[in-house]
Amino acid sequence: MAKTYDYLFKLLLIGDSGVGKTCLLFRFSEDAFNTTFISTIGIDFKIRTIELDGKKIKLQIWDTAGQERFRTITTAYYRGAMGIMLVYDITNEKSFDNIKNWIRNIEEHASSDVERMILGNKCDMNDKRQVSKERGEKLAIDYGIKFLETSAKSSTNVEEAFFTLARDIMTKLNRKMNDSNSAGAGGPVKITENRSKKTSFFRCLLL
């Protein structure tokens, strides 16, 4: 059977339990919102294929449990991720403070050039806000990461967040392929995973 996509990108949603990772995933993958989701047990993923610059991108989006007791399960999936969304709840100060801990986990376990984005979720609940948008923006700037406030309930910025992350990954892939070709490699390239956690995730190999 012919392949129905040009690229496969593996993405992770990480953050504390209850920040809305599963709701974001369902809003993007199925355009659905459900307030009765129970806390995610282990890890699950959804698929959605999008189009960017004439290319079909298959997004495999993993929803990882935020509770401390599942952290080892989450860690096993960092190495395969090409993009990671760090999610906090704007009505929960602690979930925002813990973003720094999640970033340290990424730095320890993920590839050095994985694309990252911080999402301040539940922005529809502005009357219960504990974390200002400015604080979220400042944290993102400090780490050199893009930032958006989102709402799975109202669908605010959900599409934009996933499309932005996918575009950043695609831009990086294209740049690396161009660098390989300009270095005299020539011919088609295949993107493969580099298992070393402190080196680039992306390697270009001649087919």
Swiss-Prot record:
A motif (Switch 2) lies at residues 63-80. Its cofactor is Mg(2+). The modification Cysteine methyl ester is found at C204. It is found in: Cell membrane; Cytoplasmic vesicle, Phagosome membrane; Endosome membrane. CDD domains: Rab8_Rab10_Rab13_like. It comes from the Eukaryota. A lipid is attached at C204 (S-geranylgeranyl cysteine). The keyword Transcription does not apply. GO terms for molecular function: GDP binding; GTP binding; GTPase activity. It holds the Pfam family Ras. The small GTPases Rab are key regulators of intracellular membrane trafficking, from the formation of transport vesicles to their fusion with membranes. Rabs cycle between an inactive GDP-bound form and an active GTP-bound form that is able to recruit to membranes different sets of downstream effectors directly responsible for vesicle formation, movement, tethering and fusion. RAB8B may be involved in polarized vesicular trafficking and neurotransmitter release. May participate in cell junction dynamics in Sertoli cells. This is Ras-related protein Rab-8B. It comes from Pongo abelii (Sumatran orangutan).
